C-alpha cells in the first residue's frame, strides 16, 4: 500500500478503484487489482 499526499491520480488508475474514508484516513481500494491500493492522511494522536 502506498502512502500518498494526493489521491487525485490514484483514483483514476483503474476503473474499479474507489475512495473510502475509514478512521480519519482516505483509502483507495481496488478489488480487481490490489496493487493500486493507497492511503492518505496520518492517524491523529491523542
UniProtKB/Swiss-Prot annotation:
UniProt KW keywords: Ribonucleoprotein, Ribosomal protein
A GO term for molecular function: structural constituent of ribosome
GO biological process: translation
Keyword Heme included in the entry's annotation: no
Family matches, as Pfam families: Ribosomal_L36 (PF00444)
Protease recorded as keyword: no
Gene Ontology cellular component list: ribonucleoprotein complex; ribosome
Classification via SUPFAM superfamilies: Ribosomal protein L36
PANTHER family, per the entry: 50S RIBOSOMAL PROTEIN L36 2, LARGE RIBOSOMAL SUBUNIT PROTEIN BL36B
Family: Belongs to the bacterial ribosomal protein bL36 family.
Annotated protein name in UniProt: Large ribosomal subunit protein bL36
Amino acid at each position: 500500500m502506498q502512502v500518498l499526499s494526493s489521491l487525485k491520480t490514484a483514483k483514476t488508475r483503474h476503473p474499479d478503484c474507489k475512495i473510502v474514508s475509514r478512521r480519519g484516513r482516505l483509502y483507495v481500494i481496488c478489488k480487481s487489482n490490489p496493487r493500486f491500493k493507497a492511503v492518505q492522511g496520518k492517524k491523529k494522536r491523542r
